[in-house]
Amino acid sequence: KVKAYFEKQMPVAGCCRVDKRESSPGDIALYICQACRETLEDKVKTQSMWEYLDALKDFNFPNLNGQKFYVQDCWRDRNHPEIHEAVRSLLKKMHAEAIEIEHNREKSIFCGNLHYETDDPRLKNYPNTPLYKLPEDLQTSLMQHYAAQFDPQIPVLCYCNRCYECL
């Protein structure tokens, strides 16, 4: 539904690693992925899709009838309060409830298989190493440790592809 809406409104590009289209002065690149934001923000003005959707007056949001969601704020978005606000505003527009976790918003410590701030002593052997480069058993253990904070009966809302893939 969202993709179809955007395709009617504007040209839709794919991943910035593959789609290398040029931008013109005044263009705004809407992004979903934090890596795309980081790639594009020096070339063109950027805005998250969440902010854009939140500002729409004509979008028909679904009614989620009070469904509760844990909100997993991405570590790569810790300095982007506009995204935190837009995601929560969208949940309200859909009649859903955000459950805030301890390390949320600017205090986020997790980005899927990229980053996790934890005091696990096993990480001392891997300084400044992205999680995806760690031994698989250690990655699994760290993901399980992080995910243990969530009640499995309540969905976790992730707006980062890495967080989503790992949770």
Where are these regions (language model features)?
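Iron-sulfur cluster-binding electron-transfer modules in prokaryotic oxidoreductases
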Residues: 1-167
